[in-house]
Amino acid sequence: MFRQLKKNLVATLIAALALGQVAPAFADPADTLPDMGTSAGSTLSIGQEMQMGDFYVRQLRGSAPLINDPLLVQYINALGMRLVSHADSVKTPFHFFLINNDEINAFAFFGGNVVLHSALFRYADNESQLASVMAHEISHVTQRHLARAMEDQKRSAPLTWVGALGSILLAMASPQAGMAALTGTLAGTRQGMISFTQQNEQEADRIGIQVLQRAGFDPQAMPSFLEKLLDQARYSTRPPEILLTHPLPESRLADARNRANQMRPVVVQSSADFYFAKARALGMYNSGRNQLTSDLLDQWSKGNVRQQHAAQYGRALQAMEASKYDEARKTLQPLLSAEPNNAWYLDLATDIDLGQKRANDAINRLKNARDLRVNPVLQLNLANAYLQGGQPKAAETILNRYTFSHKDDGNGWDLLAQAEAALNNRDQELAARAESYALAGRLDQAISLLSSASAQAKLGSQQQARYDARIDQLRQLQERFKPYTKM
């Protein structure tokens, strides 16, 4: 429908801190250290973890090149929650994010937040491999590895974590300065962190592979993906320095393979959604380089029915991205005729309609589909089509409902702000934009916008009272976040 990519963040800094890297490390033999053991993770309560998670998610939204594509976000969250439903010791809600980055990586941090790099779609051969990475990261969260690491560092180097967290924030404003600060902070404790990390990685593998099996995926996917990473490490000439803190020794691969071999062999087919998501991620994202190659599409064309449909969808997507709308429509039409309620097809058909200035066609198509199957992605598409078609009031009606039930989706607030602007509802436009700023961690700007909205609202009105109450809420949030902004 639409893409909103934001400023770059050195996300690997968070990955190093969160102990959740899936990429292999290049370490010399001396990096294989004795087991340091684990602590009880008593540094943070669950409530504190969630509060810190909220703070860092907002920073991530405001600085990272997040992919806010509604279809891809819906897919990775559905896949992630399928895995979470089969995990033990789940104490927080989970949220899954996708970053536009061509380096293989994933990381987990406070409060059940898991971030995937878009490159994973390029390297994962099947859905089970992608799920294996997510199960590994989910296990970092359920085992509270970050809290346990903070407890360990509290004893051995109490200032390290404060400095590292502060360096992450610095990196959001100045990547080079942030990297230098983080390198200096961690230099004195590198050996201890490597040892602790290796133990966490093995534990996340062990628990993650159990989650993978329970959720109905192929447990062999975990060792097969680890082996792919190790092979890439062997043949790479200039590995990223950050990988030095995340060793992937042969013993870790062997342990994962042994555990998978003890489980009952299964044949698991990747879902159609996996192939559609892979085509979309490779065709529209991956750091601006189209990696939806002809070779891959030709390979899918010779595969099973799901792969064949994904190949045709991918070709239609490529044509649409190249503004070849007639070709895109012709390629997509057989798929859409066979499955008129398929969200992937409907979304692409909407983009084609809007690209050809046929907003009414998009509106009629989406209204019919939405009546059959209520889907948040299609609601956003319909609201966007109404806006493009000059019907902001209809868009406003949809978006008021949408933002009420999806308060953390910046797409909804951004579209609502556009609708209110078109309707000349200045105070409501400012309030909607304020919510977008708040989600991105820009609380001062959000409060300023809400103050302006309150000043423009009718004196003593319910709207004014609502804006003032929201200002109070955001000020309270600022107070709760103060300890983290000082790091």
Swiss-Prot record:
Q: Which domain of life is it from?
A: Bacteria
Give compartment(s).
Answer: Periplasm
Primary location recorded for the protein, binned into one broad class: periplasm
Q: Name one GO molecular function term.
A: metalloendopeptidase activity
One protein family per Pfam = TPR_19
What does the entry list as the binding residues for Zn(2+)?
136, 140, 201
Q: Where is the secretion signal located? A: 1-27
One GO term under biological process is: chaperone-mediated protein folding
GO CC terms in record: membrane; periplasmic space
Active-site residues are 137, 205 (proton donor)
Q: Which UniProt keywords apply?
A: Hydrolase, Metal-binding, Metalloprotease, Periplasm, Protease, Repeat, Signal, TPR repeat, Zinc
Cite the repeat ranges for TPR.
Answer: 309-342, 427-460
- Family in the record: Belongs to the peptidase M48 family. BepA subfamily.
Q: What does this protein do?
A: Functions both as a chaperone and a metalloprotease. Maintains the integrity of the outer membrane by promoting either the assembly or the elimination of outer membrane proteins, depending on their folding state.
- Report the protein name in the record: Beta-barrel assembly-enhancing protease
- Organism annotation: Salmonella typhimurium (strain LT2 / SGSC1412 / ATCC 700720)
